[in-house]
């Protein structure tokens, strides 16, 4: 568990660490100023889209060969695709490396599947909640650390550092992660169709996939306009610092709450915790649209993090309980696929809403998306759920 947590932390940090200066790096590669935003968006979305499309393939291989080999494969390849960004001569090569990075990604979903397969099911919420804090902490610390390191070391040196971090992650996984897994012959691998047939509820599973996508849409739709919204609320001095602080507030509260809420889900039922977290998230997004000061927005974002701390552990625990162990990696890979699609769609939805309707409309729209998802999950749980099957 500890090594998987560290691996998730390093993976989350390595991705988020380079985001603050990606646009500047693309500008330094000679891209015209009027195309910088386009190529920056493409560099981010290309990796997420590629990861989404190939995730089911890696999931099937993980169910046959084990999750640990897939974790090692992902971290070793990303050592070169992320570290190699330090040597790109132009934006075309950068985009190629970002594409390869997405194709060979998959450390986090395989680490999740490994813990889900080996942890006692009655304690899966706590185990997966604890694991989720690794990604949260890495994603939280990454941007702050990346900006400081780029200032003192230079952008290319930061890419080399990220490659080194991922190499350490690869070695930790290779030597210290333990998995009880026996190689399965190709003819004996359960087909994906049978995995879904033997799950306890395909309807609920599909709803959980969509919920993972909605979580990312809601997060990424707000991300492009958050600093602009903060300025709209009257913050003009130290705008980047204040924006980073408000983003970090969400991650900090999520980090504090994930393990406890995962344990709470094991006690009261993860379906109940998920519904509560979705309605709570809807309420906080709606209130963010009504914020009149930066302080109010910061407090609301901090409170929203407690909802985030319950969402993914609840989804992962429910998927674990609904899925036959022989196909658990594929189910988590499909969940990752939907999550990646959300990462791609979110910024476009948020930017379009802000352009045509204003900044507050982004929060109103996001709250309605989350509310719709809450109602769908409520319908699914009331219609298809047999509580005894997921305990």
Language-model-detected regions and their locations in the chain:
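Short amphipathic helix-loop junctions that connect adjacent transmembrane helices
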Residues: 21-37, 225-241
